[in-house]
Amino acid sequence: MFDFSVIDEYQIEITSYCNAACPQCPRNDLGQGINPYMPLVHLARSVIDRAFDTDLCSRLRQIFFCGSYGDPIMHPDFLGILRDFRRKNPTLWLYMHTNGGVHDPEYWAEIAGIMNGYGQIDFGIDGLEDTLHLYRKNVKYSRVMANAQAFIDAGGRAQWNFIVFRHNEHQVEQARALASSMRFHNILVRKTGRFLNHETMEEIPAWPIKNSQQVLEPPINPEYRNTSMMFLPDLKKQYTAVKDYFDTTSIRCDAMIGRKVAINAEGVVLPCNFFNHNLYDARFRDGSLPGANPLSQHNGRNQIADFLSRYGLDNLNIHNNSLAGVFENTMWADLVNSWNNEHRLFECAMTCGSKFTKVWDQGGSVR
């Protein structure tokens, strides 16, 4: 069960703003323009401070600044938010994902000082100087590397996250060597599972970029391929209709097992970031987009949005309710019960089903 007394990690998307325009990110339209369904908002420092009092912070294991749409460094008061958590618990693990492409090196050195040995930054650096911009659009390689080095030099623990595409797979070993010389704690080679046609359950060979002749392609080297994506032909042979797999697979919820939940930039407490994707991702509204997902619909409505509306998003929001109060909502128990009946949510079966685990096959590391 999702129990307030045992949840010890909160994944907080403190903003939906971002400096980048990654073509496969749900916050923009294939690398051009902002997703019109997504609200642009910062989660106020005062709201976070009120929701996470000292008693709660004293028993938490981790605060993870990550989300579906935004980069935490775009929040105008991010350093203050970090300081609030550190003041309430000197050893609370503060973890974040970022592209690292804004602010000066002094800002990043300051983050290292606030973390003070209890935290980590994962820098999303998908390539080297000649390739990073092909996916991390609007991000300047030299700035990211200077900021990462400043963080490391100030005592910060950093991990290099490298999403492998065809255009950068030849640079993985160079990146490993550079990460070592810069004293990154680790380099995580991420095996993307995003090239998926949800309707045919086949791999998309090329992902378009709006107003560009460039396309994104999955890597060729089997070492960098997502295991579940390679398993797709076998999965289709096992089921007359792939929908049958999602209707019957056992579900092992990563969030519940990991004793963690997510809070989006509007302050809504959700089981995971994948629920947040369903709320605003254009691919769940426009079937013509690559990666669009018809199985997530029920009677023309997104399943997740419809499910949450029964309980009221306002009732799940930390602007209106304490975290303890949010977990008293019957939504949490109903969600768990849904995994064992015909009214299960497709997203739960897709993300945490037993045989097709493309999300977790991408690779991930917290500590």
Language-model regions, residue ranges each:
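Conserved alpha-helical substructure of the radical SAM core
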Residues: 1-120, 134-138, 142, 196, ...
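Radical SAM enzyme [4Fe-4S]-AdoMet core and its adjacent flexible, acidic
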Residues: 5, 13, 28, 33-45, ...
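Processing junctions and N-termini across compartments
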Residues: 12, 16-19, 247, 342, ...
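Short cysteine clusters
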Residues: 18, 22-25, 253, 272, ...
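Non-transmembrane alpha-helical segments in soluble domains
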Residues: 52, 82, 149-152, 176, ...
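Cysteine/selenocysteine-centered motifs that mediate thiol-based redox chemistry or coordinate metal-sulfur cofactors
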Residues: 300-367
